[in-house]
Amino acid sequence: MSWLSLTFKVGSDYVDSVSDQLLEQGALSVDVHDAGEGTDHEQPLFGEPGALPEQFWQQAEVTVLLEENTDVDEIVQAVARVMGISALPDYQLTQVVEQDWVRLTQAQFEPIKISSRLWVVPSWHDLPDPAAINLRLDPGLAFGTGSHPTTQLCLGWLDKFLKPGDSVLDYGCGSGILAIAALKLGADRVMGVDIDPNAITASLENARNNLCDLDKLSFTTALSFSGGGDPADTRQHPVFVVVANILANPLIMLAPVLMSALQPGGRIVLSGILETQADEVLQIYSEWFDMQIAAKDQGWVLLAGRKSVNRTS
């Protein structure tokens, strides 16, 4: 079995209408990404809450998956009509052959060495170091397989600075990787929070797969957390370490929440922040924390600091 893949470029004004037209004509999928990706013309759009980015890239590349027997000329002509031109100036057509997609996907994920004692290992791989702390994580419903620089920055900080017996809040837990790592590294009480219920489901599954003690590790939605409905409510039992690997704008908005969850003298770790955004985040958090850029990787930064011992709220 095989399919056809049709790729062409469109301006931002036509992305919606072209995509709708393609789906109406039977496209199996429509993928839209930055036509300048990987070049000096790349235009990052993060879609962060609180930000107002352009809806689409100025120039987008559209890739359409079609049934093998599709009349491609008809598709191309329909796209041209939507764009108000007589013909598409350029497009590429390739054949997509049936493959073992599971094996192909698995091949993209290799064990990741965070430190001499900490690894992230997909479940289908043998353990490179059975004596190490091995986090078994597979790609799934939520962010956090260990491959992204921000996840590795946070794992590296936990590996170096987390003390046995610490209490930890992982805000924006995604797959639960940081919360699970904290527990494995000796934390006594860990709570993961996420806005997405799917992330809570994924985190619990990953915690069970890693044989975590669920009496010490819990996950809850941000709604339950902010409403105080969780028995591990940090307003009653503030933690010593808060780690949040999200994005800059949500971190700015969450500053009072994260501050109130932390004990006086406690430590805060933030990532998901581009180098160009670091000063803005530092300025907001400096009201409560002695913060600094603690690490950098591939244009991303990790901010770390302590809450003033004189601040209780």
UniProtKB/Swiss-Prot annotation:
Q: What does this protein do?
A: Methylates ribosomal protein L11.
Instruction: Report the transmembrane regions from the record.
Output: none
Q: Please give one Gene Ontology molecular function term for this protein.
A: protein-lysine N-methyltransferase activity
Protein name per Swiss-Prot or TrEMBL? Ribosomal protein L11 methyltransferase
Q: Which residues are recorded as binding S-adenosyl-L-methionine?
A: T151, G172, D194, N245
User: Which classification does the entry list for the species?
Assistant: Bacteria, Pseudomonadati, Pseudomonadota, Betaproteobacteria, Nitrosomonadales
Record's GO cellular component terms: cytosol
| Compartments it resides in | Cytoplasm
Alphabetized, the UniProt keywords read: Cytoplasm, Methyltransferase, S-adenosyl-L-methionine, Transferase
What is an example of a Pfam family matching this protein? PrmA
A Gene Ontology BP annotation from the UniProt entry = methylation
Q: Which reaction does it catalyse?
A: L-lysyl-[protein] + 3 S-adenosyl-L-methionine = N(6),N(6),N(6)-trimethyl-L-lysyl-[protein] + 3 S-adenosyl-L-homocysteine + 3 H(+)
The UniProt similarity line reads:
Belongs to the methyltransferase superfamily. PrmA family.
Q: Which organism is it from?
A: Nitrosomonas eutropha (strain DSM 101675 / C91 / Nm57)
What is the enzyme's main class? transferase
**Heme: is it a keyword of this entry?**
no
Tell me where on the tree of life, at the top rank, the source sits: Bacteria
The enzyme's E.C. designation: 2.1.1.-
